[in-house]
Amino acid sequence: MTRYRGRFAPSPTGPLHFGSLVGALASWLDARAWGGAWLVRIEDIDGPRTVPGAAEDMLATLRGFGFIADEPPVWQSARVAHYEAALARLTAAGLVYPCGCSRKEIADSLRAAHERHTTLAYPGTCRTGLHGKPARAWRLRVPDGAAAVVAFDDRWQRAQTQNLATEVGDFVLKRADGQWAYQLAVVVDDGDANITHVVRGADLLDSTARQIYLQRCLGLPTPRYLHVPVVLDANGEKLSKQTGAAALDPAAPLPALAAAARHLGLALDGAACASLDAFQAAAIAAWDARFGPNARG
């Protein structure tokens, strides 16, 4: 049996917040419950959004909360050659094409499709050529018919199915601004790190079918997925740096950890929050009972 390898992959666009903590805790608990390795990847591939010093601050905060990676952290910005190689392989296989559509053109086509009550997926305008337009991005061809349907079993959200042809369309691997798209980078990174289990927020559930299809195109294994409920703010929106989420305080980790455990549905008694060691032991046992090798039902 392949040894468990999981990861936590934050973007350094600001300090870690409570929503980040829920994802870090869930991924760490799953790795510990299964006796596996827990890795950290800094997803700084989106250069314009990266905040200088944020990655180092994140790593220090993780240490303050007791989350120590089992291997040195990996930075996406140091892995550009791997993304280029993957894109070259897909291009050689005839699976990728240049797209000259502007954001406005894509928005107009989606709006027209909505008015016709038809598909809202990218319509494949540039599949047959650029039609005199300059190349802006690179897209992966999505098959038609039954081959476009990707089904997987999520360990929290259960059975999932998505028709890539009708719900997504040919999707971007390299953006018009030259930045690598999340879908390509995360698939290549997970494959190279031999990740066997992905535990992350449910806001990324919609991306999973695309990633599974891309894994198949690149001949990579598909990890097991578990998507935890996202944390919402007072307005019912996902808690994020953009909505003003407060930074975590690594000097006082236990109250936030206890709240994160409650969000994950883990029932811990008061003694579990007496110390960081006590919390970790109790939380691992509670997670194991739900999602680990000793899960009940």
Curated annotation (Swiss-Prot):
Any one GO molecular function term: zinc ion binding
- Cofactor binding note: Binds 1 zinc ion per subunit.
Pfam families xref list: tRNA-synt_1c
State the span of motif ('KMSKS' region).
238-242
* Alphabetical UniProt keywords: Aminoacyl-tRNA synthetase, ATP-binding, Ligase, Metal-binding, Nucleotide-binding, Zinc
Keyword set includes Zinc-finger = no
EC category name: ligase
Supply the EC number(s).
6.1.1.-
| Matches recorded under InterPro entries | Glu-Q_tRNA(Asp)_Synthase, Glu/Gln-tRNA-synth, Glu/Gln-tRNA-synth_Ib_cat-dom, GluQ/Sye, Rossmann-like_a/b/a_fold
Q: Which cofactor does it need?
A: Zn(2+)
Q: Where, in this chain's numbering, is L-glutamate bound?
A: R7, F8, A9, P10, S11, E43, Y182, R200
Cellular component terms (Gene Ontology): cytosol
Binding positions (ATP):
K241
Q: Where is this motif: 'HIGH' region?
A: 10-20
Positions of Zn(2+) binding: C99, C101, Y122, C126
What's an example GO BP annotation here? tRNA modification
Q: Which family is this sequence assigned to?
A: Belongs to the class-I aminoacyl-tRNA synthetase family. GluQ subfamily.
UniProt function note: Catalyzes the tRNA-independent activation of glutamate in presence of ATP and the subsequent transfer of glutamate onto a tRNA(Asp). Glutamate is transferred on the 2-amino-5-(4,5-dihydroxy-2-cyclopenten-1-yl) moiety of the queuosine in the wobble position of the QUC anticodon.
Q: Which PANTHER family match?
A: GLUTAMATE--TRNA LIGASE, GLUTAMYL-Q TRNA(ASP) SYNTHETASE
This chain's protein is named Glutamyl-Q tRNA(Asp) synthetase
Species of origin: Burkholderia mallei (strain ATCC 23344)
The gene name on file is gluQ
